[in-house]
């Protein structure tokens, strides 16, 4: 005679226990007891054959052991590479900084500046020339992204402690180190005025861009005055003498005169006068970046 039975429950493992497998024997025994109780409660009908119940229980028990063993192996295998990855790839935030950056940050009294390539020859040949403009890139402790020295493709790094001595100091201390340079007629005025005004410039530190530009413009005009005066008297030509006398006048007065004659603005007339001065064929000075040639390259 056939009888029907209903399966009110299935043997299963808890998801939390599956996600955290353990190799402890006590935990495994507790899981087995839980499976036995679940299977006994689910198959409580007397109409089901005892052999079928036993076979079902054995199959569930064996499948549970196989699944648990496979899962434990996979979990152990998956945990091992995570540990190695954490050991091989440390957090980049906690990496040790560059030694040069650390040394620079420790020594806050020494400033470091990025010198443009146009100033290489000037800093090398004229050690008494010191530029203190407001737009000079200073790298100090406030800099967050400190680049390496190899990334500076536009110029070298120049520290304030590496600036050599001034010209007069080096002449008194080490006169033999300076190479002998021929003294030109039109360079004496430039040398004398530069030495006289050097102390006045040092009194105004730090120099702003406006003061620096005004000083360079004044020195440029004075150099042109002396140059045209020397060449005019040397060639003994009336035109050169007249040209030198015109250059010796103030640039602002010439600009005002040109603006009155040509009905132009003073700023435009001033630009025309300066451009006209730059067209007089001097290979010694060129703009926009100021290049001063060496005395050995000047034709007497």
Curated annotation (Swiss-Prot):
The modification Phosphoserine is found at residue 293. It is found in: Lysosome membrane; Endosome membrane; Nucleus; Cytoplasm. The pLxIS motif constitutes an IRF5-binding motif: following phosphorylation, the phosphorylated pLxIS motif of TASL recruits IRF5. Keywords: Cytoplasm, Endosome, Immunity, Innate immunity, Lysosome, Membrane, Nucleus, Phosphoprotein. It comes from the Eukaryota. Interacts (via pLxIS motif) with IRF5; leading to IRF5 activation. Interacts with SLC15A4; leading to its recruitment to endolysosome. GO terms for cellular component: endolysosome membrane; nucleus. Disulfide bonds: none annotated. It comes from Bos taurus (Bovine). The phosphorylated pLxIS motif constitutes an IRF5-binding motif, leading to recruitment of the transcription factor IRF5 to induce type-I interferons and other cytokines. The keyword Ribonucleoprotein does not apply. Innate immune adapter that mediates the recruitment and activation of IRF5 downstream of endolysosomal toll-like receptors TLR7, TLR8 and TLR9. Following recruitment to endolysosome by SLC15A4 downstream of TLR7, TLR8 and TLR9, specifically recruits IRF5 transcription factor via its pLxIS motif, leading to IRF5 activation and subsequent expression of type I interferons. Plays a role in the regulation of endolysosomal pH in immune cells such as B-cells, dendritic cells and monocytes. GO terms for biological process: innate immune response; positive regulation of innate immune response; positive regulation of toll-like receptor 7 signaling pathway; positive regulation of toll-like receptor 8 signaling pathway; regulation of lysosomal lumen pH; regulation of toll-like receptor signaling pathway. The keyword Transmembrane does not apply. This is TLR adapter interacting with SLC15A4 on the lysosome. A motif (pLxIS motif) lies at residues 289-293. Coiled coil: none annotated.
């Amino acid at each position: 005679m056939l009888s029907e039975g209903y399966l009110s429950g299935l043997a299963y493992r808890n998801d939390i226990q599956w996600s955290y497998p353990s190799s402890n024997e006590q935990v495994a025994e507790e899981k087995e007891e839980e499976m036995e109780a679940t299977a006994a409660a689910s198959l409580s009908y007397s109409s089901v054959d005892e052999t079928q119940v036993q076979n079902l229980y054995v199959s569930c028990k064996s499948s549970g052991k196989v699944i648990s063993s496979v899962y434990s192996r996979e979990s152990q295998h998956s945990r091992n590479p995570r540990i190695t990855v954490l050991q091989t790839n440390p957090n980049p935030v906690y990496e040790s900084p560059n030694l040069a950056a650390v040394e620079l940050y420790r020594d806050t009294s020494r400033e470091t500046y990025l010198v443009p390539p146009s100033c290489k020859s000037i800093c090398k040949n004229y050690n008494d020339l010191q530029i203190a403009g407001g737009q000079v890139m200073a790298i100090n402790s406030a800099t967050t992204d400190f680049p390496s020295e190899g990334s500076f493709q536009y110029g070298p790094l120049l520290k304030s402690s590496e600036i050599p001595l001034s010209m007069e100091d080096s002449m008194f201390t080490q006169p033999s180190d300076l190479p002998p340079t021929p003294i030109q007629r039109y360079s004496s005025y430039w040398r004398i005025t530069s030495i006289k005004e050097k102390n006045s410039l040092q009194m105004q530190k730090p120099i702003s861009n406006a003061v620096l530009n005004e000083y360079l413009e004044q020195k440029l005009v004075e150099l042109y005055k002396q140059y045209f005066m020397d060449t005019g008297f040397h060639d003994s030509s009336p035109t050169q003498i007249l040209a030198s006398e015109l250059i010796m006048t103030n640039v602002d007065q010439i600009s005002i005169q040109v603006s009155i004659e040509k009905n132009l603005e003073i700023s435009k007339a001033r630009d025309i006068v300066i451009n006209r001065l730059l067209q007089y064929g001097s290979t010694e000075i060129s703009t926009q970046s100021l290049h001063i040639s060496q005395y050995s390259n000047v034709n007497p």
